[in-house]
């Protein structure tokens, strides 16, 4: 438990240090009503933050592991880019990490790559602690059932509780740790004007 909180705190600090934030954020409604049908969002829309806390118990079926992770996501002002940072600890022989579409307790298809940035898988042998992946997801990066669709379609799945991040390893090729993506605890959407 203590290790999970430390990893989460470090991940939040790392992500926040790399993000431009307005000096005095204004709390907005936690909704996607401002997201337009063309995949962008209106000029007065909020900057949105999401988080997934990953553990073996959330995998389907559950995996017994000491590995933990945190994925932090931030939507840009026009809703066309979703920046992310994926941090993990105590995990061995990583092969890949993704965003999948499915509710908690159900496995679903890959819709975006987090590590590496695309196929094929890349093995990191041995134990890994630190930032596994960071980058930006756009509509062009969506794969599987979201290929050719907009980032808004991914955000709709997040809003409905139907998106998760997970990390795959050689010993658990279906996924060793997983976490549903949701609005971040303690993080609020902020006005970007």
Pin down the residues of each PLM region.
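Sec-dependent signal peptide recognition
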Residues: 2-9
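Metal-centered catalytic cores of metalloenzymes
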Residues: 20-97, 101-193
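C-terminal motif of bacterial Sec signal peptides marking the signal peptidase cleavage site
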Residues: 15-18
């Amino acid at each position: 438990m203590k290790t999970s909180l430390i990893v989460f705190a470090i991940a939040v600090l790392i992500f926040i240090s790399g993000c431009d934030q307005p000096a005095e954020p204004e709390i907005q409604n936690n909704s996607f009503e401002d997201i337009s049908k063309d995949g962008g969002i209106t000029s007065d829309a909020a900057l949105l933050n999401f988080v997934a806390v990953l553990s073996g118990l959330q995998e389907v079926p559950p995996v017994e592991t000491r590995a933990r992770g945190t994925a932090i996501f931030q939507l840009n002002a026009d809703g066309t880019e979703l920046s992310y940072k994926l941090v993990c600890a105590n995990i061995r022989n990583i092969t890949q990490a993704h965003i999948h579409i499915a509710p908690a307790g159900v496995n679903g298809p890959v819709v975006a790559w987090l590590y590496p940035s695309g196929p094929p898988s890349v093995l990191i042998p041995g134990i890994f602690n630190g930032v596994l992946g960071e980058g930006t997801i756009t509509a062009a990066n969506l794969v599987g059932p979201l290929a050719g669709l907009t980032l808004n379609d991914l955000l709709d799945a997040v809003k409905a509780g139907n998106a998760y991040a997970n990390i795959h390893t050689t010993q658990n090729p279906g996924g060793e740790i997983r976490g549903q993506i949701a609005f971040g605890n303690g993080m609020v959407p902020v006005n970007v004007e």
